[in-house]
Regions:
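Acetyl-CoA-dependent GNAT
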Residues: 4-89, 98-103, 107, 140-146, ...
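Conserved glycine-rich acetyl-CoA-binding loop
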Residues: 65, 88-102, 109-111, 122-129, ...
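A generic secondary-structure micro-motif detector
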Residues: 36-37, 94, 117
Length: 160
């Protein structure tokens, strides 16, 4: 079951983001010092700010527990940015990420978007393959001097 997040649930959502992004941070050697903007280290104030500015946030539940989270941010008339797609390690490989992704495409399309963009750690080949297998197209890369990895940019059409 996927549904919109309420403000009171943001601390629970942050725990999901921290745990899910934490496995990737560990794998790629990310720390609060070398990558403070990574979801593994995000403060509640940032998530609350995004919520209050109107970003759409959703959770995927199994029973009473939150298994996954995602955030959609409008970036233009026809474009949304998919952010913080996160599935707790114990719920991975059960289709929750794919369900959240499909829901994101439908939600963005219902709000007039034609495309969804995402930025990932380019060196995370497993994640990149997953997005490509789920309809995304690799659009290029960029090196940012403040990040210890290359950012890969992907995009997909909404609604499908």
């Amino acid at each position: 079951m996927i549904r919109r997040v309420t403000e009171s649930e943001l601390p629970l959502c942050l725990r999901v983001i921290h745990e899910a992004f934490g496995t990737v941070a560990e794998e790629f050697g990310l720390t609060p010092d070398n990558c403070p903007t990574n979801g593994a280290f995000m403060p509640l104030t940032r998530l609350l700010e995004d919520y209050r500015k109107g970003d759409a946030m959703f959770v995927c539940r199994e029973g009473g527990a939150i298994a996954g989270f995602m955030q959609l941010s409008r970036r233009g008339q026809a474009v949304y940015e998919l952010e913080k797609l996160a599935v707790l390690p114990e719920y991975r490989h059960r289709g929750y990420g794919k369900a959240l992704l499909g829901f994101a495409k439908q939600e963005a399309a219902a709000n007039g978007a034609a495309r969804i963009h995402i930025g990932i750690i380019e060196e995370n080949e497993r994640l990149k393959r997953w997005y490509l297998a789920n309809g995304f197209v690799h659009m290029g890369t960029r090196v940012f001097s403040h990040l210890p990895f290359t950012v890969g940019f992907l995009e997909t059409a909404c609604g499908g």
